[in-house]
Amino acid sequence: MHQHMLGPSTSLGGTNNSALQSSVLSEGVLLSHSQPTREEIKKNFETREGVYRSVPSAEFSRPRPLPQYHMPPGIASAAASQIAAAGSTVRVSFLNGAEKSVESPEAVAPTSSTYEHHKNEPNGARIDMVDEAQADKICFNVGKELYVFSYRGTQTETDLSRPIDKRVYKGTSPTYHAFNQESAKNGSCQLLIGFTLGQLQIIDPLEKSSSSPFSRLYNEDRYIEKTSVTCIRWLPGDSNIFLASYVSGNLYVYDQRISAASSNNNGSSQPPPWTIHKEGDKFAIHTWKGKVQRNPVTRWQIGEGSIHQFSFSGSDGKMMATVSHDGFLRIFNYHAQELLAVMKSYFGGLLTLSWSPDAKLIATGGEDDLLTVYSVAEKRVVCRGQAHKSWVSQVKFDPYLCTTEEDLENNGIAMTSTFDDVAKDFSIRSGPVPSTSADLNSGVMNATSTFSRCSLASFNTINGAPAGNSVRYRIGSVGHDTFLCLWDITEDMLNQGNIRRHRNSTIIAPMTTLEVQTNSLVGRLEDLQEVSPGGAGVNASSDSQSITNNHTTPRPEKQKKKKFTKRLGFSKFTSGSSSATSNPVGGHKIGTLMNGASVNSESSKKQNPGLISQISCCNETRMLGSKFCPGIRDVPMIEPLMCKKVSHDRLTVLEFREDCVVTACQEGYICTWGRPGRYQPKRDCINSPGTASPESGQKPSGSTSAMTSSYGYGSDALNGVPPSRSSSTYSNSEQQLRSPNITSPSYRVSAASTSVYHRPTYAWQNAN
């Protein structure tokens, strides 16, 4: 039987003994796959504010089953993992519906019951169409498929057989997507999608009545860019501008008001006629030659390697931060097109970033397995966090658990600086960083709702009195190790002069011996220039003076060498040679740090000034121990408040909602975790006939007559009947995305194939 399943055994030596060994080996492989060993994952986890509970009725997954081919459970599970790994990264995006009160959960309950009562009516009729239009929307991609569903947080009752929109692409896969929050209205929205072959598409997944559905293609012929899309964003405050980053390290700015077909090659094999508009340290901005407006309007070349992610600060979009494969976090003034600050990862590339609600901090994560918190105003690393055992794939600030001005005033605590101070500092850039000792003005964290003030009134207090280490920020992180970690950033951690051990932090002990210089941070930064807009060096004496004031011990005349150990390797930062350059603008010498030592050479004055612009501050930040990449002992190493295994496959998504937390893994399962006091499990509705969650073993009831999209770039099916491939409803601009070498015809999934894929049930799911 095993030979029939795995194929005939191959004789290595031509004897029966070899054939027997091969058969035994095949059987052993089969048994190892059929009995996989998996760690238990958690259905709930506890923090200081309460218990977060899994919401089985609000789970999403791919409705389509795996290929119809009978395999043992272990083999099937392994095949599912391979199929998921072969596709693009699973991403989740949300469209916020109409504003609704969240003061009392009872106000939302009738909505859920009304939907539950009418969702099984013939032909999927729903009486409360107004409520359906006002509900939030969730979009996620799994492999070559894209789905859009209604989402109500902890009140969601998932029916995977009836998506709002569903698309399958042939020859390419969605890699990233984002809703246009600025232009969304009842019954209409814009969803921007990026693909592995570099194309971009804007669709309206809510439009069902029009005979010519809205669809717009950018970079259709791959003339502008041929690599995969890594991240896309809509410009805050502008419903027409969106940006897309690529594996090539390019970031393009598009304008919907300009024709999407204006950048076609028209049969020419020549590259696009870009011209440099502005250039700085490791970045350049290009525009089109001539006065004719084209899409994309500008191109940013940033760093070396792929731009993994970028994000804007707050709702005004004044600053833009990027993280790249070269390990750099770069912060730009987007409108002025100036580089404001940089930071280097401890090791490897950076994969993700997140702005704090007040735009004063940035959290990053990547291949060094560390969480890094960076202060934008002070341009320094606040702390690092170690808990993950693999790459950190997503970090997010929780806007509902960040302390507001009102909370701090009630607790008798004053904050340090405002976003206006940060923006003013970056817009002027004509002097040293202003002092951050001013009191807080009004309007700091508008993103924080009443949830943190009402439900978590005692979050920063002990028996009604202000806590000593007041929690200012809550950060979440997920990684390839399948763990979800929550971190608290306290007031003490934000104090630059306070390097003592915190209650929730510790300095990691060394493991491997490495001989480096352990002189003070002042000595390491003395001969380094500061990052300035456009790459020009400025006098850093003010920063050096401020750092000197924070250290009471004088710099020793002779540096002493000590041996300490490290947990993470950084051999790429060390070298057997040393060099130095001089700054032609400010006249300061730039000592390159090699093995922790600062070296100044008189011969550097004779270097070509043209080379200095190429090996300026970005090369300096590669050196471990500098201001831009502090050593392991230079900043506090904190521990997480909570770290739990919540998935069997690597996690790729983390989103904080008002009543829940959303995670997603590469297998394509989107899970909802109800916040404390916002969800109570109900056993009678978890496995209800109308609920088709991935955890349940029952098939959904009701009709499967939901309209199915034409897959590729085609329109949605009309009257529930998908058009044929030869239908005239497909226009030339709605052709399917595919590789030029692919000749197979497009296909679409019929209604019969919308059956629910049954996720294997594990022991933890039946636990109380």
Swiss-Prot record:
Residues 539-553, 595-608, 688-712, 734-749 have a biased composition (Polar residues). Residues 103-122, 531-608, 684-749 are annotated as: Disordered. Residues 570-582, 724-733 have a biased composition (Low complexity). Expressed in several neurons in the head and tail. GO terms for biological process: positive regulation of gene expression; positive regulation of locomotion involved in locomotory behavior; positive regulation of protein deubiquitination; positive regulation of protein localization to cell surface. Disruption phenotype: 25% decrease in glr-1 expression in the ventral nerve cord. Changed locomotion behavior with mutants displaying decreased reversal frequencies consistent with decreased glutamergic signaling. WD repeats lie at residues 224-264, 302-342, 345-384, 454-497, 646-683. Keywords: Repeat, Ubl conjugation pathway, WD repeat. The keyword Cell inner membrane does not apply. It holds the Pfam family WD40. The keyword rRNA processing does not apply. Interacts with usp-46; the interaction increases the catalytic activity of usp-46 in the presence of wdr-48. Together with wdr-48, binds to and stimulates the activity of the deubiquitinating enzyme usp-46, leading to deubiquitination and stabilization of the glr-1 glutamate receptor. This is WD repeat-containing protein 20 homolog. It comes from Caenorhabditis elegans.
